[in-house]
Protein backbone atom coordinates (compact mmCIF):
# COMPACT_ATOMS: atom_id res chain seq x y z
CA UNK A 1 0.00 0.00 0.00
CA UNK A 2 1.33 3.41 -0.88
CA UNK A 3 1.99 5.80 1.97
CA UNK A 4 1.57 9.42 0.96
CA UNK A 5 2.72 10.85 4.29
CA UNK A 6 4.37 14.24 3.73
CA UNK A 7 7.54 13.27 5.55
CA UNK A 8 9.69 10.19 5.22
CA UNK A 9 9.95 8.43 8.59
CA UNK A 10 11.81 5.21 7.73
CA UNK A 11 14.50 4.12 5.29
CA UNK A 12 14.68 0.43 4.46
CA UNK A 13 17.39 -1.60 2.80
CA UNK A 14 14.91 -2.66 0.15
CA UNK A 15 12.41 0.04 -0.75
CA UNK A 16 9.46 -0.95 -2.87
CA UNK A 17 8.50 2.46 -4.10
CA UNK A 18 9.87 5.91 -4.81
CA UNK A 19 7.56 8.83 -4.14
CA UNK A 20 8.73 12.13 -5.49
CA UNK A 21 7.06 15.46 -4.88
CA UNK A 22 8.01 18.18 -7.33
CA UNK A 23 7.28 21.72 -6.26
CA UNK A 24 5.59 23.72 -8.99
CA UNK A 25 7.62 26.77 -8.06
CA UNK A 26 10.83 24.74 -8.45
CA UNK A 27 9.79 22.91 -11.58
CA UNK A 28 12.84 23.83 -13.60
CA UNK A 29 15.25 22.99 -10.78
CA UNK A 30 16.70 19.61 -9.96
CA UNK A 31 14.07 18.33 -7.56
CA UNK A 32 14.82 16.42 -4.40
CA UNK A 33 12.77 13.32 -3.72
CA UNK A 34 10.90 14.57 -0.66
CA UNK A 35 10.00 18.24 -0.49
CA UNK A 36 7.33 18.25 2.20
CA UNK A 37 4.65 20.17 0.31
CA UNK A 38 3.87 19.84 -3.38
CA UNK A 39 1.06 19.77 -5.89
CA UNK A 40 2.71 17.16 -8.11
CA UNK A 41 3.58 13.59 -7.33
CA UNK A 42 5.68 11.13 -9.32
CA UNK A 43 5.63 7.42 -8.58
CA UNK A 44 8.21 5.18 -10.21
CA UNK A 45 8.07 1.50 -9.30
CA UNK A 46 10.72 -0.87 -10.73
CA UNK A 47 9.51 -4.43 -11.25
CA UNK A 48 12.30 -5.68 -8.96
CA UNK A 49 11.65 -4.65 -5.37
CA UNK A 50 15.33 -3.94 -4.65
CA UNK A 51 15.84 -2.06 -7.94
CA UNK A 52 18.58 -4.52 -8.89
CA UNK A 53 18.91 -6.82 -11.91
CA UNK A 54 21.45 -9.19 -13.37
CA UNK A 55 23.28 -8.01 -16.46
CA UNK A 56 21.18 -9.04 -19.44
CA UNK A 57 17.87 -8.80 -17.54
CA UNK A 58 15.43 -6.14 -18.70
CA UNK A 59 14.20 -3.59 -16.20
CA UNK A 60 10.66 -2.29 -16.39
CA UNK A 61 9.35 0.65 -14.38
CA UNK A 62 5.74 1.64 -13.80
CA UNK A 63 5.46 5.42 -13.97
CA UNK A 64 2.62 7.50 -12.51
CA UNK A 65 2.11 11.24 -12.41
CA UNK A 66 -0.49 12.89 -10.19
CA UNK A 67 -1.85 16.38 -9.64
CA UNK A 68 -3.24 16.94 -6.14
CA UNK A 69 -3.16 13.18 -5.75
CA UNK A 70 -5.27 12.62 -8.90
CA UNK A 71 -3.72 10.54 -11.73
CA UNK A 72 -3.11 12.57 -14.90
CA UNK A 73 -3.32 11.26 -18.46
CA UNK A 74 -0.39 13.32 -19.66
CA UNK A 75 2.47 12.75 -22.07
CA UNK A 76 5.72 11.84 -20.34
CA UNK A 77 9.02 12.30 -22.16
CA UNK A 78 11.92 10.14 -21.07
CA UNK A 79 15.60 9.60 -21.74
CA UNK A 80 17.59 6.56 -20.66
CA UNK A 81 21.35 6.34 -20.29
CA UNK A 82 24.10 5.00 -18.05
CA UNK A 83 24.64 6.56 -14.63
CA UNK A 84 25.95 10.15 -15.05
CA UNK A 85 26.42 9.65 -18.80
CA UNK A 86 24.56 10.96 -21.88
CA UNK A 87 21.28 9.32 -22.86
CA UNK A 88 21.44 6.44 -25.31
CA UNK A 89 17.69 6.23 -25.98
CA UNK A 90 14.59 8.37 -25.60
CA UNK A 91 10.87 8.27 -26.13
CA UNK A 92 7.44 9.46 -25.09
CA UNK A 93 4.50 7.70 -23.53
CA UNK A 94 0.96 8.85 -22.77
CA UNK A 95 -0.28 7.77 -19.37
CA UNK A 96 -3.59 5.91 -19.20
CA UNK A 97 -5.42 6.17 -15.90
CA UNK A 98 -2.31 8.01 -14.80
CA UNK A 99 0.03 5.08 -15.45
CA UNK A 100 2.37 3.52 -17.98
CA UNK A 101 5.12 0.90 -17.95
CA UNK A 102 8.43 1.83 -19.56
CA UNK A 103 10.99 -0.78 -20.55
CA UNK A 104 14.37 0.64 -19.54
CA UNK A 105 16.25 -2.17 -21.27
CA UNK A 106 19.36 -3.76 -19.81
CA UNK A 107 23.13 -3.47 -19.50
CA UNK A 108 25.76 -5.90 -20.73
CA UNK A 109 28.29 -4.71 -18.13
CA UNK A 110 27.76 -4.04 -14.40
CA UNK A 111 26.47 -0.56 -13.66
CA UNK A 112 23.37 1.60 -13.36
CA UNK A 113 20.84 2.91 -15.86
CA UNK A 114 19.18 6.26 -15.25
CA UNK A 115 15.74 7.13 -16.65
CA UNK A 116 15.09 10.88 -16.73
CA UNK A 117 11.42 11.85 -16.92
CA UNK A 118 9.59 15.11 -17.58
CA UNK A 119 6.08 16.43 -18.16
CA UNK A 120 5.71 19.58 -20.28
CA UNK A 121 9.48 19.94 -20.09
CA UNK A 122 9.06 21.21 -16.53
CA UNK A 123 8.14 18.63 -13.93
CA UNK A 124 11.16 16.40 -13.68
CA UNK A 125 12.15 13.20 -11.99
CA UNK A 126 14.61 10.38 -12.48
CA UNK A 127 15.06 6.82 -11.31
CA UNK A 128 18.16 4.60 -11.41
CA UNK A 129 18.30 0.82 -11.37
CA UNK A 130 21.38 -1.36 -11.04
CA UNK A 131 22.73 -4.31 -13.00
CA UNK A 132 25.06 -6.68 -11.11
CA UNK A 133 26.65 -3.75 -9.23
CA UNK A 134 28.39 -6.17 -6.88
CA UNK A 135 30.75 -6.86 -9.81
CA UNK A 136 31.79 -3.24 -10.35
CA UNK A 137 35.54 -2.66 -10.15
CA UNK A 138 37.58 0.55 -9.97
CA UNK A 139 39.39 2.12 -12.88
CA UNK A 140 41.81 3.75 -10.44
CA UNK A 141 45.12 1.94 -10.04
CA UNK A 142 46.75 1.11 -6.70
CA UNK A 143 50.23 2.77 -6.67
CA UNK A 144 53.04 0.50 -5.50
CA UNK A 145 54.46 3.20 -3.24
CA UNK A 146 51.08 4.30 -1.85
CA UNK A 147 51.81 3.26 1.75
CA UNK A 148 55.33 4.68 1.68
CA UNK A 149 54.01 7.99 0.32
CA UNK A 150 51.51 8.44 3.13
CA UNK A 151 53.87 7.23 5.85
CA UNK A 152 56.42 9.81 4.76
CA UNK A 153 53.84 12.60 4.81
CA UNK A 154 52.51 11.66 8.24
CA UNK A 155 56.03 11.35 9.62
CA UNK A 156 56.86 14.81 8.30
CA UNK A 157 53.70 16.32 9.78
CA UNK A 158 54.39 14.77 13.17
CA UNK A 159 57.68 16.63 13.39
CA UNK A 160 55.37 19.50 14.34
CA UNK A 161 53.70 18.70 17.68
CA UNK A 162 49.93 19.03 17.77
CA UNK A 163 49.17 22.33 19.48
CA UNK A 164 45.64 23.31 20.40
CA UNK A 165 43.91 26.49 21.50
CA UNK A 166 40.70 25.67 23.33
CA UNK A 167 37.89 28.02 24.29
CA UNK A 168 34.64 27.01 25.93
CA UNK A 169 31.57 28.12 23.96
CA UNK A 170 28.89 28.93 26.50
CA UNK A 171 26.13 29.43 23.92
CA UNK A 172 26.50 25.81 22.79
CA UNK A 173 27.05 24.33 26.26
CA UNK A 174 24.11 22.68 28.05
CA UNK A 175 23.45 20.82 31.28
CA UNK A 176 24.29 17.57 29.44
CA UNK A 177 27.50 18.48 27.62
CA UNK A 178 30.24 21.06 27.21
CA UNK A 179 31.23 22.58 23.87
CA UNK A 180 34.65 23.97 22.98
CA UNK A 181 35.98 25.77 19.92
CA UNK A 182 39.40 24.39 19.00
CA UNK A 183 42.17 25.50 16.71
CA UNK A 184 44.51 22.59 16.00
CA UNK A 185 47.90 23.00 14.35
CA UNK A 186 48.21 19.89 12.18
CA UNK A 187 51.55 20.48 10.44
CA UNK A 188 54.11 23.23 10.00
CA UNK A 189 51.88 25.32 7.72
CA UNK A 190 48.29 24.37 8.45
CA UNK A 191 45.67 24.56 11.17
CA UNK A 192 42.03 23.51 11.34
CA UNK A 193 39.11 24.56 13.51
CA UNK A 194 36.58 22.33 15.17
CA UNK A 195 33.84 22.15 17.76
CA UNK A 196 34.43 19.56 20.45
CA UNK A 197 31.40 18.35 22.40
CA UNK A 198 31.74 16.01 25.34
CA UNK A 199 29.51 14.78 28.17
CA UNK A 200 29.38 16.97 31.26
CA UNK A 201 29.65 13.96 33.55
CA UNK A 202 33.21 12.94 34.38
CA UNK A 203 34.23 9.64 32.82
CA UNK A 204 36.05 7.85 30.02
CA UNK A 205 34.43 8.04 26.59
CA UNK A 206 34.87 6.94 22.96
CA UNK A 207 36.01 9.65 20.54
CA UNK A 208 34.38 10.44 17.18
CA UNK A 209 35.94 12.52 14.40
CA UNK A 210 33.48 14.11 11.96
CA UNK A 211 35.10 15.60 8.81
CA UNK A 212 33.06 18.02 6.66
CA UNK A 213 31.28 17.80 3.35
CA UNK A 214 32.69 19.62 0.34
CA UNK A 215 32.87 23.37 0.05
CA UNK A 216 34.63 26.48 1.29
CA UNK A 217 32.73 26.95 4.52
CA UNK A 218 32.90 27.26 8.25
CA UNK A 219 31.02 25.03 10.68
CA UNK A 220 27.51 26.46 10.67
CA UNK A 221 25.44 24.09 12.82
CA UNK A 222 27.52 22.65 15.68
CA UNK A 223 24.36 21.71 17.60
CA UNK A 224 22.85 19.46 14.93
CA UNK A 225 24.55 16.28 16.17
CA UNK A 226 24.67 16.82 19.91
CA UNK A 227 22.97 13.46 20.36
CA UNK A 228 26.49 12.03 20.21
CA UNK A 229 27.55 13.82 23.39
CA UNK A 230 24.20 12.99 25.00
CA UNK A 231 24.90 9.31 24.29
CA UNK A 232 28.37 9.24 25.78
CA UNK A 233 30.69 10.25 22.93
CA UNK A 234 33.39 12.88 22.69
CA UNK A 235 32.88 14.28 19.19
CA UNK A 236 35.03 16.64 17.13
CA UNK A 237 33.32 18.27 14.15
CA UNK A 238 36.09 19.77 12.04
CA UNK A 239 36.57 21.97 9.00
CA UNK A 240 39.53 21.66 6.63
CA UNK A 241 40.45 25.15 5.39
CA UNK A 242 41.55 26.91 8.57
CA UNK A 243 38.39 29.03 8.65
CA UNK A 244 37.37 30.24 12.10
CA UNK A 245 33.59 29.72 12.46
CA UNK A 246 33.39 32.94 14.49
CA UNK A 247 34.79 35.16 11.72
CA UNK A 248 32.57 37.86 10.31
CA UNK A 249 30.82 37.56 6.96
CA UNK A 250 33.15 40.21 5.55
CA UNK A 251 36.23 38.28 6.68
CA UNK A 252 34.81 35.09 5.22
CA UNK A 253 34.13 36.75 1.87
CA UNK A 254 37.65 38.17 1.71
CA UNK A 255 39.29 34.82 2.46
CA UNK A 256 37.14 32.69 0.17
CA UNK A 257 37.84 34.82 -2.90
CA UNK A 258 41.32 33.28 -2.85
CA UNK A 259 39.83 29.86 -3.59
CA UNK A 260 38.80 30.84 -7.17
CA UNK A 261 35.44 29.02 -7.11
CA UNK A 262 33.41 27.11 -4.57
CA UNK A 263 35.21 23.76 -4.70
CA UNK A 264 38.28 24.87 -6.63
CA UNK A 265 40.52 23.53 -3.89
CA UNK A 266 39.82 20.03 -5.23
CA UNK A 267 41.80 20.89 -8.38
CA UNK A 268 44.50 22.92 -6.64
CA UNK A 269 47.91 21.30 -7.26
CA UNK A 270 46.48 18.18 -8.88
CA UNK A 271 49.42 18.00 -11.31
CA UNK A 272 51.74 16.90 -8.50
CA UNK A 273 50.93 14.45 -5.72
CA UNK A 274 53.24 16.36 -3.33
CA UNK A 275 51.56 19.71 -3.93
CA UNK A 276 47.89 18.68 -4.09
CA UNK A 277 45.68 20.68 -1.73
CA UNK A 278 44.07 17.60 -0.23
CA UNK A 279 47.39 16.30 1.10
CA UNK A 280 47.25 18.52 4.16
CA UNK A 281 43.55 17.69 4.58
CA UNK A 282 44.16 13.94 4.79
CA UNK A 283 47.08 14.55 7.14
CA UNK A 284 44.89 16.85 9.26
CA UNK A 285 42.35 14.10 9.82
CA UNK A 286 45.02 11.82 11.26
CA UNK A 287 46.46 14.66 13.37
CA UNK A 288 42.95 15.26 14.71
CA UNK A 289 42.98 11.63 15.83
CA UNK A 290 46.37 12.32 17.45
CA UNK A 291 44.68 15.07 19.45
CA UNK A 292 41.56 13.10 20.38
CA UNK A 293 43.56 10.14 21.63
CA UNK A 294 45.59 12.47 23.86
CA UNK A 295 42.52 13.59 25.81
CA UNK A 296 42.50 12.40 29.43
CA UNK A 297 38.80 11.47 29.19
CA UNK A 298 39.24 9.26 26.09
CA UNK A 299 38.47 5.66 27.06
CA UNK A 300 41.74 4.43 25.56
CA UNK A 301 40.06 1.98 23.17
CA UNK A 302 37.44 3.39 20.83
CA UNK A 303 38.24 5.74 17.94
CA UNK A 304 35.44 6.35 15.44
CA UNK A 305 35.11 8.40 12.25
CA UNK A 306 31.81 9.49 10.73
CA UNK A 307 30.77 11.72 7.84
CA UNK A 308 28.87 12.13 4.59
CA UNK A 309 29.85 12.96 1.00
CA UNK A 310 33.33 14.52 1.21
CA UNK A 311 33.06 13.81 4.94
CA UNK A 312 32.28 10.19 4.12
CA UNK A 313 35.34 10.10 1.89
CA UNK A 314 37.54 11.58 4.61
CA UNK A 315 36.15 9.11 7.14
CA UNK A 316 37.13 6.19 4.90
CA UNK A 317 40.49 7.81 4.16
CA UNK A 318 41.21 8.20 7.88
CA UNK A 319 40.16 4.62 8.58
CA UNK A 320 42.48 3.44 5.81
CA UNK A 321 45.40 5.57 6.98
CA UNK A 322 45.16 5.17 10.75
CA UNK A 323 45.00 1.72 12.39
CA UNK A 324 43.81 3.35 15.62
CA UNK A 325 40.36 3.82 14.04
CA UNK A 326 38.10 1.08 15.40
CA UNK A 327 34.90 1.80 13.42
CA UNK A 328 33.87 3.94 10.46
CA UNK A 329 30.54 5.34 9.25
CA UNK A 330 30.29 6.89 5.78
CA UNK A 331 27.36 8.22 3.76
CA UNK A 332 27.59 8.29 -0.05
CA UNK A 333 31.37 8.87 -0.17
CA UNK A 334 32.82 11.42 -2.58
CA UNK A 335 36.32 11.30 -4.14
CA UNK A 336 35.73 7.69 -5.17
CA UNK A 337 37.13 6.33 -8.45
CA UNK A 338 37.41 9.90 -9.69
CA UNK A 339 39.06 8.80 -12.93
CA UNK A 340 36.26 6.31 -13.64
CA UNK A 341 35.04 8.46 -16.53
CA UNK A 342 38.06 7.22 -18.48
CA UNK A 343 36.35 3.82 -18.43
CA UNK A 344 33.35 5.39 -20.20
CA UNK A 345 31.17 5.24 -17.10
CA UNK A 346 30.38 7.29 -14.01
CA UNK A 347 33.26 8.56 -11.93
CA UNK A 348 33.17 10.07 -8.47
CA UNK A 349 32.64 13.58 -7.21
CA UNK A 350 33.95 16.21 -8.00
CA UNK A 351 33.33 14.95 -11.56
CA UNK A 352 36.52 16.17 -13.20
CA UNK A 353 35.03 15.30 -16.60
CA UNK A 354 33.14 18.59 -16.40
CA UNK A 355 36.38 20.58 -16.46
CA UNK A 356 39.03 20.88 -19.15
CA UNK A 357 42.32 18.99 -19.15
CA UNK A 358 41.67 17.16 -15.89
CA UNK A 359 42.64 13.68 -17.06
CA UNK A 360 46.25 14.28 -18.04
CA UNK A 361 48.63 11.45 -17.06
CA UNK A 362 50.06 13.62 -14.27
CA UNK A 363 46.67 14.39 -12.76
CA UNK A 364 45.39 10.83 -13.05
CA UNK A 365 48.56 9.69 -11.31
CA UNK A 366 47.94 12.14 -8.46
CA UNK A 367 44.30 11.09 -8.15
CA UNK A 368 45.36 7.52 -7.41
CA UNK A 369 47.14 8.62 -4.22
CA UNK A 370 44.04 10.45 -2.99
CA UNK A 371 41.20 8.27 -4.26
CA UNK A 372 38.99 6.66 -1.64
CA UNK A 373 39.19 3.29 -3.39
CA UNK A 374 42.84 2.92 -2.40
CA UNK A 375 42.10 3.69 1.24
CA UNK A 376 39.07 1.38 1.23
CA UNK A 377 41.36 -1.50 0.26
CA UNK A 378 43.35 -0.92 3.45
CA UNK A 379 40.57 -0.58 6.03
CA UNK A 380 40.60 -3.24 8.76
CA UNK A 381 37.94 -1.92 11.16
CA UNK A 382 34.14 -2.46 10.88
CA UNK A 383 32.46 -0.13 8.38
CA UNK A 384 28.86 1.03 7.96
CA UNK A 385 28.00 2.72 4.65
CA UNK A 386 24.77 4.28 3.40
CA UNK A 387 24.02 5.32 -0.17
CA UNK A 388 21.12 5.89 -2.53
CA UNK A 389 20.68 5.00 -6.18
CA UNK A 390 19.20 8.32 -7.31
CA UNK A 391 22.26 10.28 -6.16
CA UNK A 392 23.76 12.43 -8.92
CA UNK A 393 26.45 13.95 -6.69
CA UNK A 394 28.08 10.77 -5.42
CA UNK A 395 26.58 8.24 -7.83
CA UNK A 396 25.74 4.66 -6.86
CA UNK A 397 28.31 3.33 -9.33
CA UNK A 398 31.18 4.71 -7.26
CA UNK A 399 29.60 3.89 -3.89
CA UNK A 400 29.33 0.25 -4.96
CA UNK A 401 32.93 0.27 -6.14
CA UNK A 402 34.08 1.40 -2.70
CA UNK A 403 31.81 -1.12 -1.00
CA UNK A 404 33.06 -3.96 -3.17
CA UNK A 405 36.69 -3.23 -2.24
CA UNK A 406 36.22 -3.29 1.53
CA UNK A 407 37.30 -6.64 2.98
CA UNK A 408 36.83 -5.63 6.63
CA UNK A 409 33.55 -6.46 8.43
CA UNK A 410 30.94 -4.24 6.81
CA UNK A 411 27.26 -3.37 6.89
CA UNK A 412 25.21 -1.24 4.53
CA UNK A 413 21.95 0.64 4.53
CA UNK A 414 21.00 0.96 0.87
CA UNK A 415 18.18 3.43 0.26
CA UNK A 416 17.46 3.39 -3.50
CA UNK A 417 15.09 6.34 -3.29
CA UNK A 418 17.70 8.71 -1.90
CA UNK A 419 19.45 11.38 -3.85
CA UNK A 420 22.28 13.18 -2.05
CA UNK A 421 20.77 13.15 1.42
CA UNK A 422 20.03 11.08 4.48
CA UNK A 423 17.28 11.53 7.04
CA UNK A 424 17.79 12.49 10.67
CA UNK A 425 16.57 8.99 11.55
CA UNK A 426 19.39 7.45 9.51
CA UNK A 427 21.95 9.74 11.13
CA UNK A 428 20.75 8.73 14.58
CA UNK A 429 20.80 5.06 13.61
CA UNK A 430 24.44 5.42 12.62
CA UNK A 431 25.25 6.76 16.07
CA UNK A 432 23.50 3.73 17.58
CA UNK A 433 25.59 1.46 15.31
CA UNK A 434 28.76 3.11 16.61
CA UNK A 435 27.48 2.61 20.14
CA UNK A 436 27.35 -1.12 19.44
CA UNK A 437 31.00 -1.02 18.35
CA UNK A 438 32.18 0.29 21.73
CA UNK A 439 34.61 -2.16 23.31
From Swiss-Prot:
GO BP: any one term: xylan catabolic process
Top-level taxon: Bacteria
Signal sequence, start to end: 1-31
Temperature and activity: Optimum temperature is 40 degrees Celsius with glucose-pentaacetate as substrate. Active from 30 to 50 degrees Celsius. At temperatures of 30 degrees Celsius and lower, less than 10% of the maximum activity is left. At 50 degrees Celsius, retains 60% of its maximum activity.
Summary of pH dependence: Optimum pH is 6.0 with glucose-pentaacetate as substrate. Active from pH 5.0 to 8.0.
Active-site positions on this chain: 309 (nucleophile), 391 (charge relay system), 420 (charge relay system)
Single GO MF annotation: carboxylic ester hydrolase activity
EC numbers: 3.1.1.-
This protein's pathway: Glycan degradation; xylan degradation
Keywords tagged on the record: Carbohydrate metabolism, Hydrolase, Polysaccharide degradation, Serine esterase, Signal, Xylan degradation
Protein family: Belongs to the carbohydrate esterase 7 family.
Function recorded in the entry: Involved in degradation of plant cell wall polysaccharides. Has acetyl esterase activity towards a broad range of substrates including xylose-tetraacetate, 4-O-methylumbelliferyl acetate, glucose-pentaacetate, cephalosporin C, and acetylated xylo-oligosaccharides smaller than xylo-heptaose. Displays no detectable activity on polymeric acetylated xylan.
Protein's recorded name: Acetyl esterase Axe7A
Amino acid sequence: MFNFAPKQTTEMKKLLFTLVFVLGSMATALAENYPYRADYLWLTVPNHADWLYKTGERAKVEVSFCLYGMPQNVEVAYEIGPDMMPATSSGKVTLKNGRAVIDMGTMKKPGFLDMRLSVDGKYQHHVKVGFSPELLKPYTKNPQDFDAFWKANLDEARKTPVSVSCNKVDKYTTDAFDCYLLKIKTDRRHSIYGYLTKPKKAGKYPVVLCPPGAGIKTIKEPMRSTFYAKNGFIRLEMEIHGLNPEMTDEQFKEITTAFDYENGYLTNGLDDRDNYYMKHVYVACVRAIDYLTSLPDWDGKNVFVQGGSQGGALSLVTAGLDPRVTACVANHPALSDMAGYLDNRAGGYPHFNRLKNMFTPEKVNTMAYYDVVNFARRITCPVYITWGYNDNVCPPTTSYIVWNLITAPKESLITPINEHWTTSETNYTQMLWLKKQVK
